[in-house]
A protein has these predicted regions:
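N-terminal beta1-alpha1-beta2 submodule of the flavodoxin-like/Rossmannoid cofactor-binding fold
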Residues: 1-102, 106-107, 197-198, 202-325
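Short, histidine-centered active-site or binding-site loop motifs used for metal coordination
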Residues: 7, 143-145, 173-175
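Active-site-adjacent alpha-helix of alpha/beta-hydrolase-fold enzymes
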Residues: 21-29, 153-167
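Short beta-strand elements in bilobed, periplasmic/extracellular small-molecule ligand-binding domains
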Residues: 32-35, 166-175
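Helix-loop-strand module that forms the ligand-binding subsite of alpha/beta enzymes
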Residues: 61-161
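A charged, well-structured terminal subsegment
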Residues: 163-171, 191-208
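Active-site rim beta-loop-alpha module in soluble metabolic enzymes
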Residues: 176-180
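Catalytic cores of secreted or luminal carbohydrate-active enzymes
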Residues: 181-192
């Protein structure tokens, strides 16, 4: 059983240290451990070229136009049975680097779309994708903040697990953490998070758990949260209404007070649309396939070309100072 720890903080700073605290605890449970300081790796931002989604829905393979370390990083994550991310909290949320790896995960590594690609490859008489891409994985997140600005980081962090459909064990943040290594309660909690992750990873191995079929059968430690489906706790409330949508899984409903706490009420008949389960991913993949098809046809449309040419000619972009001679 292998546990990978990934820190996105300064070298040997609080995030690195707390990640290693959890890894040490996982090692004591029998895990093989590995540590990555992600700032040492060349990870570029997603350009939005959609080569990945087109490659998947058209059966061409897993494609990315960026030439950097992300593919190697993704393979490291896939090889592990459990993964822990420890990320500094920037302006209440995840770091820019963390957002970049989340953007790079989806849709190019979305399990639903990869299943579609796997089927297309096999239909064409070719070898399908490596089965390990469809194996379930335990994943945990910890945000480390210097103050109490932290309430967006849990949703930001969980987005990384959304595309592959991996199981989130713990998703937490620690505030006021400049001296966190001296705060015994938080150090002990990190040890517990490491042990929880090792236990969940071992359960996945023992049950040979795949992403498909394990969406509602995995019992993990949870906090009391508003939405029992994805354990989301952040919602967009439509102005002037009681209608809201979970920022994580996309289910829509209303917030109600039950036993002194907010609970999210939604129609169970809509659950198949949720972004974190395969049925919702297949729907999303079909939407992308149809939209890409419409766009490809538009490229042949004279009116489309005319409008593109008109607005492209309105103004030129200002050159980047670093690229000027």
């Amino acid at each position: 059983m292998k546990i990978l720890g990934v820190s996105l903080g300064t070298k040997n700073g609080n995030n690195d240290t707390m990640c290693r605290v959890a890894l040490e605890a996982a090692k004591e449970k029998g895990a093989e451990i590995e540590f990555i300081h992600l700032l040492d790796w060349d990870i570029q931002y997603c350009s939005g070229c959609v080569a990945c989604s087109r490659g998947l829905v058209m059966g061409k393979g897993m494609i990315c136009s960026r030439q950097d370390d992300f593919k190697a990083f993704y393979e490291k994550v896939v090889e592990a049975d459990g993964v822990l991310f420890v990320d500094p909290i920037f302006e209440s949320g995840a770091t820019g680097l963390y957002h970049s790896i989340t953007d790079r995960m989806g849709p190019g590594h979305d399990t639903g779309m990869m299943k579609m690609l796997d089927g297309k490859l096999k239909e064409a008489g070719k070898e399908g994708l490596n089965p390990r891409y469809f194996r379930q994985k335990a994943i945990s997140f910890v945000g480390i903040g210097g103050s109490d600005w932290a309430v967006r980081c849990e949703t930001d962090h969980a987005m990384f697990a959304l595309s592959p459909g991996w199981k989130v064990v713990n998703n937490e943040f620690f505030s006021w953490c400049k001296d966190v290594i001296m705060q015994d309660d938080k150090v002990e909690r990190m040890k517990e998070i490491g042990r929880n992750l090792a236990d969940a990873a071992q359960q996945i191995i023992d049950e040979d758990m795949q992403v498909e079929g394990s969406e509602k059968t995995f019992s993990l430690e949870r906090k009391r949260r508003c939405l029992p489906h994805c354990q989301g706790n952040n919602f967009y409330i439509y102005p002037g209404t009681t209608h809201c949508v979970c920022e994580l899984c996309g289910l829509e409903g209303t917030l109600e007070i039950v036993d002194g706490a907010f609970k999210f009420k939604y129609d169970p008949a809509t659950e198949h649309h949720a972004h974190d389960i395969l049925s919702g991913k297949f729907l999303h993949g079909q939407d992308i396939f149809e939209n890409e098809g419409r766009l490809m046809n538009l490229y042949k449309d004279p009116e489309f070309k005319k409008r593109k040419e008109h607005y492209t000619a309105v103004c030129e972009p200002t050159p980047a100072p670093s690229k000027q001679k």
